[in-house]
């Protein structure tokens, strides 16, 4: 079994959502952790648990971030974490249970395994994954929206995300 050490400094979670039917708002979560277990030589053996702290949301606008922390969206006073627990990983996809605001649904996302490399700064082996996909926020009770007088709604229901996770490897 390979020992993986999560490297948050070289990892991130970014998202975007349609805004006013004409543009998009982007953001990130600053606090998260990924536990990874299994054999790096057998991707199907890997099991991961990602924990995201929704109160760490950052869209570069404090008023918007505070609204996103409110009960209209993440309700961070009552919901201090979101989790994704894998059930199956292969070279192209990851299937797992995503929990947001106490709602759990199985989701399938794209995954890109970036191989193993040696860090020239410290000689340590590292590996990384990029996971991306689309989440229907309404499935998780995040329903806030407003109708526009020109038609359509203020916010899209689908949130696109990309998460990049890097790990050092101890053999």
Swiss-Prot record:
Q: Cite the InterPro entries for this sequence.
A: Lipid/polyisoprenoid-bd_YceI, TTHA0802/YceI-like_sf
Question: What Gene3D superfamilies does the entry give?
Answer: Lipid/polyisoprenoid-binding, YceI-like
Q: Name one Pfam family in it.
A: YceI
- Supply the SMART domains for this chain: YceI (SM00867)
Top-rank taxon:
Bacteria
Q: Which residues form the signal peptide?
A: none
Q: Which family does it belong to?
A: Belongs to the UPF0312 family.
- What is the protein's given name? UPF0312 protein SERP2314
Please name the source species.
Staphylococcus epidermidis (strain ATCC 35984 / DSM 28319 / BCRC 17069 / CCUG 31568 / BM 3577 / RP62A)
